[in-house]
Amino acid sequence: MNFLHSTLDRLREFTPVSNTSTFRTNGQITPEEFVAAGDYLVFKFPTWSWADASPTSKRANYLPAGKQFLVTRGVPCHRRLDDDFAGDAGHDETVVRDGEDFRGDGPHSPGDDEDGWLRTGGLAASQEARVRDVRTVDESGEMGEREDDEDDIPDMEDDDDDDEAIIRDPKADNASSSRRTYTIYIAYTPYYRTPRLYLSGYLSSSQPLPPHLMMEDIVGDYKDKTVTLEDFPYFSNNIKMASIHPCKHASVMKTLLDRADAALKLRREKQRQGKAVPGSKDTGMEGLVDDFEKTKIGDKKAVLEGLKAGGNGNDEWEVLQHDQDFANEEEEVAIRVDQYLVVFLKFMASVTPGIEHDFTMGV
């Protein structure tokens, strides 16, 4: 199956490039917009940089020389997502397709296809708690009061281990070490007209991480489904990397754009009416970090909850910081096209929560 996907992806790279902007209508971007978004990312976060194809014969003619893809190196990853990473275990799995799926329930509802982001439980229609709320349910089925986060509860066993008393085997297998680093690449895909993320891992000894071991750092729901091992198209030596398939990137981005615009419009309307705006302090990218920490990439239902709630005090979406004022508020948008990759990386992090993507973004 992985071979079939890889073959189809290589054929799709020959798709004619479109230079018509559809960023606001469907979440797709043109090569020119990809370059603008890359320039913004590099300017704001210097750990990112542009790179050229090697050899130059691998260059894509729709991108400038020297700006073929984006790269950041040495991104830390300190934990494996093995069986101890519970996630949403114990819940039914749901395939999330495009945003239209939430408007119909039948087998032929819009967006009905086999592809999509796999979401596991915790978001049924009857669930009243938001994605960040964890509640207990008693024997009668009643939902209890919200409990303290387990991270705030000290563990008695934490004090039992004396690190200095532990005898460590220096010859232990490096492949199982918890310390890894990743090089992250962002390339442009002309078929889907979106960015595509590639991951190349290294062991603590700076030795290349075998491709199959990279899957230890991918959330189990996505392994071999939306994340596969692919050759990086801009290198000649066919280096296998973990790649997040871009088939649904545009629809997810469109959902986020719509939600951010709706929140901005509501805030401006309240400001014109002289009303206090709950949670209106501008936290910029920090709002995005908090919003995506516990929301999975296919969790568009949770994203849409903010719109249905009318932007109340629980809606923690914050507008991106603007570098310039807009003369006409009616044309003001929450996320500009040059800020595309910043938001893109935030929801990509939900696939690889063990990789510290924010290490690359000083927020």
Curated annotation (Swiss-Prot):
The N-terminal region is involved in phosphatidylethanolamine-binding and is required for atg8-PE conjugation. The flexible region (FR) is required for atg7-binding. GO terms for biological process: autophagosome assembly; autophagy of mitochondrion; glycophagy; piecemeal microautophagy of the nucleus; protein targeting to membrane; protein transport. PANTHER family: UBIQUITIN-LIKE-CONJUGATING ENZYME ATG3. The active site is at C247 (glycyl thioester intermediate). Belongs to the ATG3 family. Residues 84-174 are annotated as: Disordered. InterPro entries: Atg3/Atg10. Residues 84-171 are annotated as: Flexible region. It is found in: Cytoplasm. It comes from the Eukaryota. This is Autophagy-related protein 3. The keyword Nucleus does not apply. Monomer. Interacts with atg8 through an intermediate thioester bond through the C-terminal Gly of atg8. Also interacts with the 40 amino acid C-terminal region of the E1-like atg7 enzyme. Also interacts with the atg12-atg5 conjugate. GO terms for cellular component: cytosol; mitochondrion; phagophore; phagophore assembly site. Residues 251-339 are annotated as: Handle region.
